[in-house]
Amino acid sequence: MIRVLHSVSNMDRGGIETMLMNYYRHIDRDKVQFDFIVNKKKPSDYDDEIRRLGGHIYQSPGLDPLHYPAYLRFVQQTVTADPRIRILHAHNEAMGLYALKGAEKAGLQVRIAHAHNIWIVRDYKWPLKMFCILPAFFNALGQAICMECNTVGRI
C-alpha cells in the first residue's frame, strides 16, 4: 500500500477539500491511502472521517513566514518517518513550494504542485508568493497546466 500526503490549509468543507474527500471515499484504500498536512491549528470538518477511513492528519507548525524553516523540517520529518508515503500533492498554490522542498529534501520522488486557480490573494504574503510561484512549479516532477479547454504540459 502507498500513502499520498496532501498538503492543504485545513480539511473543512471547501471545494478542494470536498473534492479530495470524494476521491478518498471511492479509491481502493487497500492499495492507496491519503494523509494530510494541515496548516491551520483548529479541528476541521473532515478530520473524524479521514481517521475512520485510515488516513492520518499531521498538524504543521503553520505556513507563516516566521515558521518556514520549521515547516520545511516538519515536512521532511513527516515524509521520512513513514516509508509508505510515496507521493506529496501540494494544494497550496505558490506556498506549496515549502511542502515540495521538504519532500524533495526527504528524497521523495513524486511531488505534485496543484494550483486550483490562477489568482493569488494580495495579502501580506503576496511578495513571497510571487517569489515562490515559479520555483514551486519547477520543483514538482513533471508539469501540466489546464486552463479551460487549452492544455500545456511537460510530463
Language model segments and positions:
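Membrane-interface segments of envelope glycosyltransferases acting on lipid-linked substrates or membrane lipids
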Residues: M1-I155
